[in-house]
Amino acid sequence: MSATTACWPAFTVLGEARGDQVDWSRLYRDTGLVKMSRKPRASSPFSNNHPSTPKRFPRQPRREKGPVKEVPGTKGSP
């Protein structure tokens, strides 16, 4: 029981001293909630932003390659 009591103060101290992400991941690993922490992290807005950025980059070069070939063809037709 004493371990649980020591964990609570660590949450506030570490959370206020460092950050919620670092503390949460470290505490989750210690408590064994790594599996649970992975689920909320995926639903987190931060996770959504990460995959969105890398997906946008590869989309730009792909779009350029596509229209580049169609642009000259469309211009020549009319």
UniProtKB/Swiss-Prot annotation:
Main location: cytoplasm
Stretches assigned to coiled coil: none
GO terms (BP aspect): centrosome cycle
Localization (cell): Cytoplasm, Cytoskeleton, Microtubule organizing center, Centrosome; Cytoplasm, Cytoskeleton, Spindle pole
Cystine bridges: none
Membrane-spanning parts: none
Region of interest (Disordered), residue spans: 35-78
GO cellular component: centrosome; cytoplasm; spindle pole
Signal peptide from the UniProt entry: 1-19
Expression tissues: Expressed in chondrosarcoma, melanoma, cartilage and testis, but not in other normal tissues.
Alphabetized UniProt keyword annotations: Cytoplasm, Cytoskeleton, Signal
Biological function: May play an important role in maintaining centrosome integrity during mitosis.
Name of protein: Chondrosarcoma-associated gene 1 protein
Gene that encodes the chain: CSAG1
